């Protein structure tokens, strides 16, 4: 089976969030048994094109967007995946000067890229074309209007239903879409506005989200009734498939950044397992200037953005100070106000023996925190899937989550973690923290059962890939 993914992010090359990681994991798992290709735009200022001798092909092609255009497709293989980078030769201003993945004119830029990608797919042929989020939503309409050879199915995955690609009808008219297919993207209440996600929903054969609970939640999203109508119309061709993590990348067995490597097999003698965690904790506390007297260790490894529940993060700081356990927060702030608030907290708590706030993300330090911490807190307002809770469980670190989206699908309260429900209830959140800390301190048998359940949780990529294959073959 030949599968082509179109997206804006792909973690080995460029990423801004979980989409790039999820696509990489899925493509890697599919490539084990199927011809798998990922098509993304080339950002010359953000990553370097592979050397010519490492490329497997260089193709010139034409596409239509705001007139006849020319592009070059550079292809190479990475871990069995064919990666194709598009350079828009006659529209260089769209990507060549971009210093970030996302800018203010994304709808126009991504539609131009989508037009080039669709032209390439029509030329190359594919059995499955798999789109990721609204960014390449135009591809669905273009391929429905003019299918490629051997095309069996167009699949759309919603990594974040909150982002939809609102744009103008004028931009859709710049493509080769005819009036019928433009109408699939058009808003009835405002015919001059088109929504790339809306058209992609109608023009795709199957729609997936990145967790079963998130699939249910988006059917109850009434923030735009026309988008709600579109997703409701597709509900019989909608399925939530939980993302997996690459256990060859994330795991304490071989992680070179740890003070002490360990395996889940050590848990046959729990004391040995916890001794390994303790060695990592000691090394981390020394690095961060924390006191080992404060236990357990709770961490938050997250972007600090409204989606991630920053109001709960502040409550966690107060709770840690009141209850004498360690809290480590690491992540980048999004938004000036949040940055100012957390920078002030960082400064005021710089000499605290049990709280550290680190506002510059480091992959190495994050891995050391995963291994050292006893718990990871993820109080998200919404979470389509979430990967950090699964990574935490791989390291024997118990997740404390708000029961939403993929967090609800992966964490069972009192079984392999702790959870709360109300997105605005500090009392419920603090009770969850207290229950987790008290269990750790006073009920060692229950704590061991919870950690064992974490270590036995299945989060491999192959499970997710097999579920996508079921959809491809339907």
From Swiss-Prot:
The keyword Transferase applies. It catalyses: [(1->4)-alpha-D-glucosyl](n) + ADP-alpha-D-glucose = [(1->4)-alpha-D-glucosyl](n+1) + ADP + H(+). InterPro entries: Glyco_trans_1, GS/SS, Starch_synth_cat_dom. Its EC number is 2.4.1.21. It comes from the Bacteria. Belongs to the glycosyltransferase 1 family. Bacterial/plant glycogen synthase subfamily. This is Glycogen synthase. It comes from Chlamydia trachomatis serovar L2 (strain ATCC VR-902B / DSM 19102 / 434/Bu). The gene is glgA.
